[in-house]
UniProtKB/Swiss-Prot annotation:
Localization (cell): Cytoplasm
Molecular function GO labels: imidazoleglycerol-phosphate synthase activity; lyase activity
Species for this entry: Tolumonas auensis (strain DSM 9187 / NBRC 110442 / TA 4)
Protein name: Imidazole glycerol phosphate synthase subunit HisF
Subunit note: Heterodimer of HisH and HisF.
Length: 257
């Protein structure tokens, strides 16, 4: 396996970076471009930007900030938000993004995954999955339109089945957003990650729950994920990226410089 990746996640709403808890009650974290530059300078391996209300608002991500981010950072970045067509993805990639991620639009039209992979290559196509553990049924369920709590809905897919399906259709990477853990900083859902890791033959990125450095270590060493995505611990300065990388190296995790 290649070196593991540390990936700050920047949720974008109304032109600024926000962060919620379990996808609700978002507070402003700062401006997009300065935060992106800060993380690149601190040693992040990659950045992910989610325009969290684009799909629920039936629009495509605002491209004006995509080009500004591309001008100030020299690490790969991925953009998500309402991408419903090859043309939508093409424009975002032309503005400077290295990858595009689709989530709700893929659930609406699974064939879109294949169309994008055929046009741009699987290495450019990430599928985000918002997974919710239903304690009543004991199942992991995929949710859609999670950027707007009034429109969020449970889909017909269980998370394991959707993970298998998106790989068949050409997903080059999967970001597993674990909704129950999101923003509460109690650790990634290692049980879910191990379950999905066994089904996932493409790079798997853990998202939701990081609160301490050991949580990153456990995601890499116990669940064998390729990357760990986090937001609030980076936005609020709880975990500095250089210190996190030094810790992980010391714990035997192969990490990029």
């Amino acid at each position: 396996m290649l070196a593991r990746r540390i990936i700050p996640c920047l949720d974008v709403k109304d032109g600024v970076v926000v962060k919620g808890i379990q996808f609700r009650n978002h507070e402003v974290m700062g401006d997009i471009v300065p935060l992106a530059k800060r993380y690149a300078d601190e040693g992040a391996d990659e950045l992910v930007f989610y325009d969290i209300t684009a799909s629920s608002d039936a629009r495509v991500v605002d491209k004006s900030w995509v080009s500004r981010v591309a001008e100030v950072i020299d690490i790969p970045f991925c953009v998500a938000g309402g991408i419903k067509s090859v043309e939508d993805a093409k424009r975002i990639l032309e503005f400077g993004a290295d990858k595009v991620s689709i989530n709700s639009p893929a659930l609406e039209n699974p064939a879109l995954i294949t169309e994008l992979a055929d046009r741009f290559g699987v290495q450019c196509i990430v599928v985000g999955i918002d997974s919710y553990f239903d304690a009543a049924t004991g199942q992991y369920q995929v949710k859609q339109y999670t950027g707007d709590e009034n429109r969020t809905r449970i889909t017909k897919w269980t998370t394991p089945d959707w993970v298998v399906e998106v790989q068949k259709r050409g997903a080059g990477e999967i970001v597993l957003n674990m909704m129950n853990q999101d923003g509460v900083r109690q650790g990634y859902d290692l049980t879910q990650l191990k379950l999905i890791r066994d089904l996932c033959k493409v790079p798997l990125i853990a998202s939701g729950g990081a609160g301490e450095m050991v949580h990153f270590r456990d995601a890499f060493q116990i669940a064998d994920v390729d990357g760990a995505l986090a937001a609030s611990v980076f936005h609020k300065g709880i975990i500095p990226i250089p210190e996190l990388k030094a810790y992980l190296r010391n714990e035997g995790v192969q990490i990029r410089d």
